[in-house]
């Protein structure tokens, strides 16, 4: 695999038609919201879609829901990720556990991830950083031994795919961000 040495852009130019379309969506009210939810459910074959203000807000809600009624308090994340991820874990009252990443893929260092997994881990958050698909199947396989939930962070990768699957469709729960 060739090592990518450029960073993805952090923004894209918006045309006047893009801006006007967003206003139509805002003014569309409930119908527009329901239409968006339906389209997202169809695209990602999701049982449920919830719209919240940000990826961080989504992750906090997911973590609080998972932690309710569980003694597990550790959340494993890649050591190289967006600041919002560990920030959300702390906001949810949980413990951040960092796992080294493979510098070629920016995915977990899988031998280290395997060593970190135990009955105290609530969930593992594979991250599709810069739109590069993480190996969620491998994470699920390792987590299955301990009954650990996989929370797929697709905040930077909506629409990206791997092996004929869209990112955000392999975790037990997933979240995206449009901002």
Regions found by a protein language model. Name each.
Residues 1-70, 92:
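Conserved PLP-binding active-site segment in aminotransferase class I/II-type PLP enzymes
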Residues 33, 55-59, 81-82, 106, ...:
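Conserved donor sugar-nucleotide recognition element shared by glycan-biosynthetic enzymes
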Residues 48, 95-97, 149:
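Conserved beta-strand segments of alpha/beta enzyme cores
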Residues 51-54, 77, 126:
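A short beta-strand submotif of the Rossmann-like class I SAM-dependent methyltransferase core
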Residues 62-116:
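Conserved PLP-anchoring active-site segment centered on the Schiff-base-forming lysine
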Residues 104-179:
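Active-site phosphate-binding strand-loop segment of PLP-dependent enzymes
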